Amino acid sequence: MRAPGRPALRPLPLPPLLLLLLAAPWGRAVPCVSGGLPKPANITFLSINMKNVLQWTPPEGLQGVKVTYTVQYFIYGQKKWLNKSECRNINRTYCDLSAETSDYEHQYYAKVKAIWGTKCSKWAESGRFYPFLETQIGPPEVALTTDEKSISVVLTAPEKWKRNPEDLPVSMQQIYSNLKYNVSVLNTKSNRTWSQCVTNHTLVLTWLEPNTLYCVHVESFVPGPPRRAQPSEKQCARTLKDQSSEFKAKIIFWYVLPVSITVFLFSVMGYSIYRYIHVGKEKHPANLILIYGNEFDKRFFVPAEKIVINFITLNISDDSKISHQDMSLLGKSSDVSSLNDPQPSGNLRPPQEEEEVKHLGYASHLMEIFCDSEENTEGTSLTQQESLSRTIPPDKTVIEYEYDVRTTDICAGPEEQELSLQEEVSTQGTLLESQAALAVLGPQTLQYSYTPQLQDLDPLAQEHTDSEEGPEEEPSTTLVDWDPQTGRLCIPSLSSFDQDSEGCEPSEGDGLGEEGLLSRLYEEPAPDRPPGENETYLMQFMEEWGLYVQMEN
């Protein structure tokens, strides 16, 4: 009963949270008001080698707030959702469902709910997850073995996730039979990268540079739907030094180079010895100086000296004089040579330039002139030069013939001297006429070699006719045969000359009989002349022509 005048007592209301705790059975979650919080976002499965982990992000606006999460999963084809006790009221944003989704041939779903206080969010579901197609293949294990110019890469396929560490390992190669690897190689020296796809577990990289650092990383992939690849860690290895190059360098510097130098030195020594023994140091005679002309294959010889004039020394046996007839013959030969001049003296033009002097070579003539004294000899030489100068026109090229007249000592009687002088004058007239004709022909004939020979003019072996009929061609014996075209100088043997000398029967007064080839080159010293005069001429002849003459006593 209530006391009169006193109000009735009402029970105090309990807090709502306390009422929920009292009403909830012991051990059960307190129900929450759904929809009071936003849902978690980005709910996905992250699977690597069949290790399946569910991931999500916190609800919007609740970052930094202590929110708990509850996860449930669903096997495709069944009717109810299944709870995972380890993933209920957790404060992390991932849940490992590898054991619940270990059958990679099935498909799975998962959902997450956020709880904060008495408020909770609605369930946020993931998409269908197919482990066989969506799991990532982890990188293989890589082992490198280096050589001088190659690197061997050994690959080991990754293993499938194991529930218990004591379980036997299962290779991903057993699950995916078409597993392949993409190997990338980086040359750190040239900074060049190339890739190569392999299906087996061994790869040999050849044709590499020795003593060079190479870095390798490998990716595993399965042909089919695209999936993310996880590359391996970069591993680097340096190739070995090239021992063969060092060995070659040692061979070259220690064997090849010394042997080459030794062979070269011996070759130089052998060549020097051969040249010293077999290659002579002879020089051509000074008289044989080869001069080439303007035309092809036209050459001639010119003596070393410009002009050589040797006066004839006469050995007078009797006093005799040149008759008036001989002098008239000499003048007539000069007149005949002057008549051969094609241009009269009245039409001569003064030369505008100095006359060109050309040498056609020379040959030594042995001229037997029988005179009284040296004065007659000098007069004859001057007469010959004057007659030659008269036959040359001023506007033509002057031709100089160089003669080397050697001394001849002749002993003859007066009658023979007179007859020989006539023959010699006629011969000189013919020679002057031929020289004048060569001077008139022009520059074309200057290129041809002049080849008079050294002849023995034997006056006792010929017969002469009158000066009107002209001198006949005299048979002569060639003592020196010199051909300018071939450059050969031939001297007949002494025996051949002795045979020719035996065929002639000289007179008793002739001092030249049976003296041989060199009788014209030297003479026994006479009582009235120095004994070494002829030897001087012989030595000069040997020096100019480079000859070696051995005289027999």
Curated annotation (Swiss-Prot):
GO-annotated molecular function: cytokine receptor activity; interleukin-20 binding
Where is the major localization of this protein?
membrane
Which Pfam family, any one of them, does this sequence belong to? Interfer-bind
Q: In which tissues is it expressed?
A: Widely expressed with highest levels in skin and testis and high levels in brain. Highly expressed in psoriatic skin.
Per UniProt, the ranges with Acidic residues bias are 499-513
Q: Does the keyword Electron transport apply?
A: no
Question: Which UniProt key words apply to this protein?
Answer: Disulfide bond, Glycoprotein, Membrane, Receptor, Repeat, Signal, Transmembrane, Transmembrane helix
Q: Where is the composition biased (Polar residues)?
A: 334-346
Q: What positions does the record give for glycosylation?
A: N42, N83, N91, N182, N191, N200
Q: Which residues lie on this side of the membrane: Extracellular?
A: 30-250
- Signal peptide extent: 1-29
Q: What are the start and end residues of every segment in region (Disordered)?
A: 333-353, 462-515
Subcellular location(s): the record lists: Membrane
* Repeat among keywords: yes
Question: Which loops or segments lie on the Cytoplasmic side of the membrane, by the record?
Answer: 272-553
> What does the record list as GO biological process?
cytokine-mediated signaling pathway; positive regulation of intrinsic apoptotic signaling pathway; regulation of bone resorption
InterPro entries, from UniProt? FN3_dom, FN3_sf, Ig-like_fold, Interferon/interleukin_rcp_dom, Type-II_Cytokine-TF_Rcpt
Q: Which family does it belong to?
A: Belongs to the type II cytokine receptor family.
Q: What is this protein called?
A: Interleukin-20 receptor subunit alpha
Q: Can you name the source organism?
A: Homo sapiens
